[in-house]
Amino acid sequence: MILAKCCHDTDILTWLVGSPCREVSSFGSLAHFNSAHKPDGAPQYCLDGCMHRDTCPYYAPRFYLEHPKAISDGFVSVVSLDPSHEAVLHALQRGPYGRCVYQCDNDVVDNQVVNLLYENGVSVSMTMCAFTEHCERIINVMGSRGQIRGNMESSTLEISDFATGNHTTLHVHTPSGGHSGSDAAMMREFLQTLRSGRGSKTSADASVESHLIALAAEESRLQNGTAIHMKEWRTTV
């Protein structure tokens, strides 16, 4: 999960800290989306007459057929390339996105915490959780002279100065497009690098490091939170 969804977070965190990561520890599990929590009598597919459709928060048709932003937010395109009601309905009847969430072969965690210790002494705590109303990123940077809180959904940065007591809120422009404009920006940067012959603003080594941290987090999780020493562990992968 951390590699798939949070390796860019470890990338940004490492850039902010400005130091190599020294140790990683992590805990996480598939706590809820498993057969132990399956409602009694629930069929394998939501559309096979599930008696819990009005009470189950994960009833698939509610998200892909009834949600007002199902198409605009891109949910439907994952289920079916044809966004018509009939096509999506057919895909949910026997496709993977129409299965009961408690009866899938998923082995990916639904919650995970990662602790990072950097060579310069900075420590980081990162939490990934599936159970949240808002799918957003929140960062809280706590320093000796101030604090910065960032909220990706509201596109704001809140800056607090301990010495003066001043509080400043910055509203950041968020471009449209995939990953808040990052997909197009990465392609532009890649093409400019090829055309100019100059190096990229971010190195391949930095990208690899963010992936290694994510892999180390999973290694630690599988070892019940045992701390992974990055300098030694890098030589084994």
Positions of predicted regions on the chain:
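Soluble or luminal CAZymes and related metallo-dependent hydrolases
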Residues: 1, 5, 106, 182
